[in-house]
Amino acid sequence: MAQQTFTGRKRVRKFFGHIKEVAEMPNLIEVQKASYDQFLMVDEPTGGRPDEGLQAVFRSVFPISDFSGTSMLEFVRYEFEPPKYDVDECRQRGMTFAAPLKVTLRLIVFDIDEETGAKSVKDIKEQDVYMGDIPLMTMNGTFIVNGTERVIVSQMHRSPGVFFDHDKGKTHSSGKLLFAARVIPYRGSWLDIEFDAKDIVFARIDRRRKLPVTSLMFALGLDGEQILATFYKKLIYKRIKEGWRVPFDANRFRGYSTVNDLIDADTGKVVLEAGKKLTVRAARQLQEKGLKALRMSDEELLGNYIAEDLVNPKTGEIYAEAGEEITDKLFKVLNEQGYKDLPLLDIDHVNVGPYIRNTLSADKNMTREDALFDIYRVMRPGEPPTLDSAQAMFQSLFFDAERYDLSAVGRVKMNMRLELDAPDTQRTLRKEDILAVIKTLVDLRDGKGEIDDIDHLGNRRVRSVGELMENQYRIGLLRMERAIKERMSSVDIDTVMPQDLINAKPAAAAVREFFGSSQLSQFMDQTNPLSEITHKRRLSALGPGGLTRERAGFEVRDVHPTHYGRICPIETPEGPNIGLINSLATFARVNKYGFVETPYRKVKDGRVTDEVVYLSAMEEGRYRVAQANVPLDAKGRFTEDLVVCRHAGEVVPMTPDKVDYMDVSPKQLVSVAAALIPFLENDDANRALMGSNMQRQAVPLVRAEAPFVGTGMEGVVARDSGAAIAARRSGVIDQIDATRVVIRATEDLDPTKSGVDIYRLMKFQRSNQSTCINQRPLVKVGDIVKKGDIIADGPSTDLGELALGRNVLVAFMPWNGYNFEDSILLSERIVKEDVFTSIHIEEFEVMARDTKLGPEEITRDIPNVSEEALKNLDEAGIVYIGAEVRAGDILVGKITPKGESPMTPEEKLLRAIFGEKASDVRDTSLRVPPGVQGTIVEVRVFNRHGVDKDERALAIEREEIERLAKDRDDEQAILDRNVYSRLADMLDGRQGISGPKGFKKDTKITRAVLDEYPKSQWWLFAASNDKLMAEIEAMRKQYDESKKGLEQRFLDKVEKLQRGDELPPGVMKMVKVFVAVKRKIQPGDKMAGRHGNKGVVSKIVPIEDMPFLEDGTHADIVLNPLGVPSRMNVGQILETHLGWACAGLGKRIAQTVDAYLSKQDVKPLKETLKRIYGEDETIKTLNDNELLELGHNLSRGVPIATPVFDGAKESDIEEMLKLAGMDASGQSTVYDGRTGDPFDRKVTVGYIYMLKLHHLVDDKIHARSIGPYSLVTQQPLGGKAQFGGQRFGEMEVWALEAYGAAYTLQEMLTVKSDDVAGRTKVYEAIVRGDDTFEAGIPESFNVLVKEMRSLGLNVDLHNSKLGPAPTSEAAE
């Protein structure tokens, strides 16, 4: 893989993969971005917007007419205005990043002719109406809601359409399979059709009481005869003198058990003796021999069913109704009437069952009216039905596009399942659809066809942001519609404008509710770039309209064959959500119908082409797909005679000519996180699951370091997550500092656009998880970059590659029991050199409110606080930036007015002497909470409109304005430099026809000539070339616009700064303080590798006590070898060996670099690199300086990539170890640091990539002496967040009881918990120095007494001494 990028030349990864990647991996957050773009369609395409997304919502709700039909409100188009605040401002001010939506509406008023009722247009008014703010997506696929970044997770739900299923024999005791069909619309009523144990078919609407399915068919307008004709064939039995002649059909008579002999009606021969069963084969042979008809006796007709009403044509008397069973009595009547031909239903009880006929005879409804009334009673119990209302209700259930929508997906699925051909614009049900569903269900009961698998990905679809938002907005608009209709009827329609009819609140509220409190709108996991990307690619089966944890069974959670290449089989949470929350596979994408697709290479006549086709799970079932690692020759033909393929959920060997497709890449079946685990194929799946989940919890470290052993996915994740910054166009680095990079573009130059790109870097921002987001530039002034090159690293990235942890030297050996049960032993070097140190930024805020007793005040003047405690505060009472603070320090001084309480004489005296402000305020300052200590890095002060700003707020504002002005001036200077240099290039060497004052006509314009004039006069030069002059004019126009734009942007930002802030009601002022906390690794912190090998740091050992190698290198970490065999994650051992080889090769390269620096001979370096990398394209193109830089970068270790399922083999690892001059076993002699003696056996030593996880002991450890109590029970609260106590639970009580520690137990249950009086007495006793106290009644006992009283049981406490126990004599 040639990595010709800017960063790719600074550090080259040796690639072990053998399979070339044919398909480009789609952008990893495409799922989110594409979906929302399609919903918003911000830029209207020419020819108007297509009917999807927001446009479709408006089209479906509008036009709205009033009740009388005299006026109509039509939708014309919509557009977005630019957002009021940009992303950063929204983050800082706690606003939502949203754009106002303007909708053009047209109000049409009609004149209605009273006699003819004809309408004529009287008046048309058009107006733009504001319809609320619609949140916009940021560049990285997230939303900023109230200042926090959120992600809308995509939802997996059951696809609309029709599903056939059975109860697996669970309902009825006999274990009989009861079949059921369900028609699920996108919105509207569900229709269930099901069998019961007696084989009668019922229908349910919306899971209500069941009705016979024939009632539903009556309601659809069929009568009994038509129903039977729909489901059964008609057989004509003809009278012959020996009995009846019946046409013979092999399919119908298969499995027929004979009672009498079967006789050929034409020849009179016996074709099958009595008591035998006619097999399928025998029936077919009889047909082939030419058997046309059978002879049946009169008895054999009994038990059959009449197919149509038999009526006396003269009198109209009905002898038999359709579906009636032939009995002796009926047979006599028919014989008397002399029927020669009897039409019978083709029901043989073997191939065709009498279910519909039995349902019809069991149905008490006989007409359409009865059936409609019955359905109405089920749907609206208690309301008396009328024919009109019943008909209207039934019509609106399934046939009204307003109430019922199958959606295009539902219609496509239904057509496929029932083999219909309705267009996908037909979104409601039709009579044919319902009948086809019933027919298919009955066929299933007769043993024809298969039931559906609801966990097949062809039956589950994904609803992404756009679609979820569309549904929400539709709900909002429908609420609005009712209000609009009412308002249209109540106002004078001739004088109003559309604006007066519309209240946009419901629509805006629906959107706000969705983003704020929907289960699918989640607080983004921002621990590191990988966790962001994974969160955006998540698929959840939970949420509104989805499953619930409790009801989801095993099948839904299980891995299904159709997940291959679509959903990762590995990455899912452990615990109650397992299998319900999944992750999209690396190459998967969602198609327009919401089904997940995966790419395959097309195979033509046994040859694999490079054509890539995306297939959904339904389409894939028809084809045979080969694995990505099948051996191919140079021409793309399969080298083996049999190729293992997947077909219809099975794995089958095929000959090469039968193969249709082949996987594009071995990593297409796993998700991003799993694809980052090297040697994933050597890990047990459970551990791989933990590995991929724990990488998401890795905290960004102070110094990121890319892994020696990677998989080649690291760069992709860093780029797509937006953590690392990529160049938008190629160019040259013009200017650079820690906060921004300026690139002068050299490609895609457009005279109407600026020739300069400015990239702002984020400096020490707080993420959602309080980790630190900091970007730093990788380029120098004068560097040449191409489009897409990484120019700045972000958190957890190193030279444009994801770097979640550090490479550390690991020895697998026990060490004094300190690595028992997965504990981890660390060397002091790790702490001293800040290897696993991370920075966390905590945010604290305080609000000054306007209370009933007066306003709260932020001030330095706080009662009863020493000057020492105020040393970090400025005169406004706010802490300085850069101050070091620890738990309990004041960050912001605040006082709150106290309620008036009766004053003691002393207080009155003080009041009289010192005036008002003696004691009427209390200290409510913001203090640093326990367990936090760090440095103040930022302070923000927010003031309400019209409140005077304090000194600190003004200082911050001035600083901010200065920064903005500097930015503007810098941009202006860059723009000037850029434009004038381009202008000089254009004019240089041209013949001038005019110029500024003093310029001679027809002189050649040169740089020297230009330099005589100030730059602003250069525009006056004119050359004879018209095309050139047009370009210069365009450039000047663009220059003037840019200049104006810069100034305007500056003024806007300053105006926003000075305007004052929108604060919650009642808040006058708000201060936010950010504290940076440096967390070194310490015992109790959790660490993990990438293979699910997690542990807790148990001890930090002085470096001299750690085991060391022969060259004196000490191990950094000692892990327990027993953690490997039972866990079956051997990948970590392979990684250790390969990492060891990487480090060894790094040492080799370091030696050649030193040789180059001392002797200026580059040859050894080139040769070493060639030995390691072979014929790598990138290395061949480097010059000596670049080679030297590469050598420096590789001297710690040579990075390699071993892709999942296609990585380094054992032989490759051995070869690398030999290249590095190491022992091929990967083991080394290790010496004990404490004694200096070698250990008895060789030890596996090598480099593992270790992560520090976001479970830090500092965040968990907690202690309380006194603190808050619960109001009702008066017991201490629980949990660290509430500063609670430790629960002394049931088992702890048992322990004290077992020891007989009665007084300790009493103390625990009373004075240390909820005996309120006792608590205060203990305090008083301690103050007096007394050590006796008495326990009282615990408050929780009083609560119990009160509860009993509330149940009507009066419980009284008698506080009296008991008399002596009665003696036995008195008792007698």
From Swiss-Prot:
CDD domains (alphabetical): RNA_pol_B_RPB2
Catalytic activity: RNA(n) + a ribonucleoside 5'-triphosphate = RNA(n+1) + diphosphate
GO CC terms of this entry: DNA-directed RNA polymerase complex
Pfam families from the UniProt entry: RNA_pol_Rpb2_1, RNA_pol_Rpb2_2, RNA_pol_Rpb2_3, RNA_pol_Rpb2_45, RNA_pol_Rpb2_6, RNA_pol_Rpb2_7
Record key words, sorted: DNA-directed RNA polymerase, Nucleotidyltransferase, Transcription, Transferase
GO molecular function, one term: ribonucleoside binding
EC number(s) per entry: 2.7.7.6
Biological-process GO terms, alphabetical: DNA-templated transcription
Oligomeric and partner information: The RNAP catalytic core consists of 2 alpha, 1 beta, 1 beta' and 1 omega subunit. When a sigma factor is associated with the core the holoenzyme is formed, which can initiate transcription.
Function description: DNA-dependent RNA polymerase catalyzes the transcription of DNA into RNA using the four ribonucleoside triphosphates as substrates.
Recorded family membership: Belongs to the RNA polymerase beta chain family.
Protein's name according to its UniProt entry: DNA-directed RNA polymerase subunit beta
Lineage: Bacteria, Pseudomonadati, Pseudomonadota, Alphaproteobacteria, Hyphomicrobiales
Gene (UniProt): rpoB
